[in-house]
Amino acid sequence: MANILENQLFTAAKTIEQQLDQQLDRLDNLDSDDLKVLREQRLREMKDLNNKKQEWLRNGHGTYTELADEKEFFEMSKKSPNIVCHFYRDSTERCKIVDMHLKILAAKHVEAKFCKVNAEKTPFLTQRLRIKVIPTIALVKDSKTKDFIVGFTDLGNCDDFATEMLEWRIAHSGAIDYKGDLMQPPDVKRKPFINRPQKTIRGGYDSDDSDIDLDD
């Protein structure tokens, strides 16, 4: 699975590189009229992006909030195409670490809605997404769960992982716009792993079945 993902990322990177080369070639051959059209196009894109940002902010993006129940989650999934949702439990200390990082990322990535739900108070949603380990972060795009970050295994198996590491991991789902290299994790130093038992809740979790339609 890791090799497949690596090959896919490599292919995507090569495609992007080729597209950039083609764009640079076109820029070299532009005249004044072409440059004017390009500037006008860029202005329209900036205006569209600003309108999107305003809509995102009206829908609660930019802040990390708690959802009261399943109904609020499903309502939000209709308004926000990108969702980063932390399933937590009050008794799990590691959830506080996740809260700290997601609060930072929520302000940085307004294109996604960052939120959390209490797994014990949302049994229907927790079982539907087959959440078993706490903390788990569900990554939703266009009303479909694309990926899950289960515990801290993907974050270096340490409690003091960098926010950039979590950002990089979230970006693999496409739920946020990421400017870095998806093929290379951030170069951060970590302390030795503190082995703590992961909290589990009833129900199963299957990481291979990650494309669950929330509209059903």
Curated annotation (Swiss-Prot):
Alphabetized UniProt keyword annotations: Coiled coil, Differentiation, Oxidoreductase, Spermatogenesis
Tissue/organ expression: Highly expressed in germline cells of the testis from the spermatogonia stage until the early spermatid stage but is no longer observed in late-stage spermatids in the distal end of the testis.
Residue ranges that the Swiss-Prot or TrEMBL entry lists as coiled coil: 13-59
GO cellular component entries: cytoplasm; cytosol
Knockout mutant characteristics: Viable, but males are sterile with seminal vesicles of reduced size and lacking mature sperm. Sperm fail to mature past the canoe stage. RNAi-mediated knockdown in male germ cells results in disrupted spermiogenesis.
Domain of life per record: Eukaryota
Keyword field contains Oxidoreductase: yes
Domain Phosducin positions: 29-163
Any one Gene Ontology molecular-function term assigned to this protein's record: protein folding chaperone
GO biological process: chaperone-mediated protein folding; microtubule cytoskeleton organization
Catalyses which reaction(s): [thioredoxin]-dithiol + NADP(+) = [thioredoxin]-disulfide + NADPH + H(+)
InterPro entries registered for this protein in UniProt: Phosducin_thioredoxin-like_dom (IPR024253), Thioredoxin-like_sf (IPR036249)
EC number from the UniProt entry: 1.8.1.9
Transmembrane residue ranges: none
SUPFAM superfamilies: Thioredoxin-like
Function: Has redox activity with thioredoxin. Required for male fertility and maturation of sperm past the canoe stage during spermiogenesis.
Similarity annotation: Belongs to the phosducin family.
Protein name: Phosducin-like protein 3
Protein's organism: Drosophila melanogaster
